[in-house]
Amino acid sequence: MRILDSQGKPGGLCPLKHTDVKAEVSGFLARVTLTQEFHNPRDEKIEAVYHFPLPQRSAVDRLTMDVGGRVIRGEIKRREEAERLFAQARKEGRVAALLDQERPNIFTQSVTSIPPGATVKVAISYVETLPYEDGVYEFTFPMVVGPRYIPGKTAPGAGPDDAEPATAGTDQVPDAARITPPHMPTGMRPGHDVSVEVAIDAGVPLEQITSELHEIEVDRDSNHQAVVRLKEKDAIPDRDFTLRFGVGGMQIADAVLAHRGERGGYFTLMLQPPNRVGAEDVTPKELVFVLDTSGSMGGLPIETAKRVMRLALEGLYEHDTFNLITFSGDTSVLFDKPVPATKDNLRKANQFLEGKRGDGGTEMMKAIRAALADTDAQDHIRIVCFMTDGYVGNDMEIVGEIQRHPKARVFSFGIGNSVNRFLLDKMAEQGRGEAEYVFLNRGDQKDTEAAADAARRFYERVRSPLLTDISVDWNGLPVEDVYPKRLPDLFSAKPLFITGRYTGAASGVMRLRGKAAGADFLREINVDLPDSEERHDALASLWARTRIDDLMAQDYGGLQTGNVKKDVEEEITRLGLDYRLMTQFTSFIAVDDVVTAPGEAPQRAAVPMAMPNGMRMGAVGGLSESVVVTSSVETINTSSAEIATTIEHRRLDELPLNMRQATEFAKLVAGAAPT
């Protein structure tokens, strides 16, 4: 890792030394605190800038900064006000920490005026609900922000921030520099280590505890409690830490948690779906499979995705219709329209897949529109299946596009060990489908089994949904602002979480209705809303986070480009301030009272990420505007893929973006002088 000076030249070792993660899991709730330790090895003060991931469902509600034993509690402010206070602290020589949210799963930690030889610790805390399926809970802590492909035209005057990687903003992704941290070459450590400790209190007997991608140590305190630690403290942080733990081989009952304090009453219901019963739904289906063949999917990711897709094709019935779409810098469609799943058409599909390799950019929007476009098949249920790592900068724009096509069901497959879960989860949520994640690099047999399991689960969900057409009757209980507003269908043995507020103490019965295997389904659940309950205070943060997610869904396009509807921005900001939550419009700021580093402005330091496991350096390609080459000498800017001149009337349609090495540019244009 290197400190970068104001001209972007290397200046020394990066200050991030260690990240410590401690999680407390109680039932389906987790409180997680990560402490980032920064140290200045230089003889001049520095400012560290670190882009890092957090779970997309997390409600970040606490920040503290430790400067030489002085602990400063962070305050939540409007983003522009927090940035003003941070700039003032920098000018005055005070240590300060600023935490910004760029996406629900990407954050920026800036620490300014770190004196020579000093250590500053910043602790960030969040709460989240844990996914649960078939008797198993899952806790995930992401460790890497993967490279993003940035579509669009470079915005006028959108040069890179001097603290950020050299990625200019575009008309589609104006904040590109804040979601694309620098990356180390594949397999190289970024210079800091990570420790993880998860304390589990399941409340019921614990069964097997496993981690898909890391070695762990497990200490069992009792039959329902355990402490799990990451064993490989010096492992390269290039993949998500995913912990799964079974609970007693028993069916978890519906659960109601409530909290009522000064801000009123809040509740969360975890509603279990019915068991899978009845025959398959054999209604003819129109399935469109979409495969990401961009550079970031090169190698094992795309081969795994192709394996999943081939297995999925084998599960088609002859009365089903299907089509295949692939995308990278451009979009390829196998058939003009969906065709019957005959042996001959399936053979053509497998031949089409055979030659696909990962290369080029990730122009995902074209594929989204092609896959979701209306067809004439009125008697077929439309199901679209995307297989991708989600490494794009215009993720919110893509989710907004899916919103505009409510007739299709969207199922997403995340292929890789550190994919963009925000995009993949939201694609499935807005498309009323489900997300599936397929891990890599666990050995040939395990990777093959994972692909087969993913294909099997896909058809099980599509052909035998557990519960559809869900509605809730609160039966007079004093509840309000309940989310989600549109209840999803349940395709797998995952619970439905409902969160809301209540205005007064009450007890009663709520009724859950729906369709299970074509028959009417009814479940009655006793609900107790207490007059006072100090426990479960995190429910207020979870409700506010869910409310913010609902507001974001009202203007994904504006959030993407920075032109948000005023009422949406103001309501998100109000919730962030009232509930001390991170949002795109509210930030945490902590400023030391003591002037410890007066004098000149600090040297700024960008902290690089490890390259995601399974992904090669330079894999994220890009698409330039078509240019005609007219001269014999030219200069190419490798940080933005801009072409200064052209050469010998050659036409170049596709060029890699900032992740490509200069030598690769030289191969594209003879006689080029890469810069």
PLM regions and their residue ranges:
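An acidic, Ser/Thr-enriched
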Residues: 62-102, 121-290, 312, 445, ...
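Exposed beta-sheet edge/beta-hairpin loop segments within beta-rich domains
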Residues: 109-117
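Periplasmic N-terminal accessory/gating domains of Gram-negative outer-membrane beta-barrel systems
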Residues: 620-675
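Short, charged loop segments at secondary-structure junctions
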Residues: 82-96, 282-299, 307-310, 314-320, ...
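Von Willebrand factor A/integrin I-like adhesion domains
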Residues: 215-217, 418-465, 579
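Asparagine-centered strand-capping/turn motif at beta-strand->loop junctions
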Residues: 23, 37-44, 52-54
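N-terminal, polar/Ser/Thr-rich
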Residues: 1-27
